Amino acid sequence: MDVKLELVAVPVTDVDRAKAFYERIGFHADHDVAVSEEIRFVQLTPPGSACSIAIGKGLTRMIPGSLDNMQVVVADIEEAYADLRGRGVRLTCRRQSARSLCPCPPSGRRSRRRAPW
């Protein structure tokens, strides 16, 4: 039996700012639906991925910023670095290790506890 991860909720306080950030790093906005004043659903998918993230308002009881880790995989770290830099994404470091990048949040502040949006 195959099990595939489809969608992961990422709680945020500022949906528009978070959406702009994810689009800036290359995610595609598949859906952006305001169901009501209290509920908005935004689904974003990284290029080539079968799994998406969901940001929005009224989607989860998780505290905004409480998801403190997300990993993505790329075939070529140098190409990914150049692509992000070309998109104007500021990186806090070129590499933490041979296979990782450290994107800087939109505010320029690093935060392990809470996302700036």
What does each model-identified segment do?
Residues 32-33, 42, 72, 81-117:
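Vicinal oxygen chelate
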Residues 28-67, 74, 93, 113:
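Conserved short beta-strand elements that form part of the metal-binding/catalytic scaffold
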Residues 2-3, 9-51, 86:
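Core segments of cupin and vicinal oxygen chelate
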Residues 17, 77-81:
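Short, conserved charged micro-motifs
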Residues 2-7, 65-69:
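Short, solvent-exposed beta-strand edge segments and adjacent coil->beta transition regions
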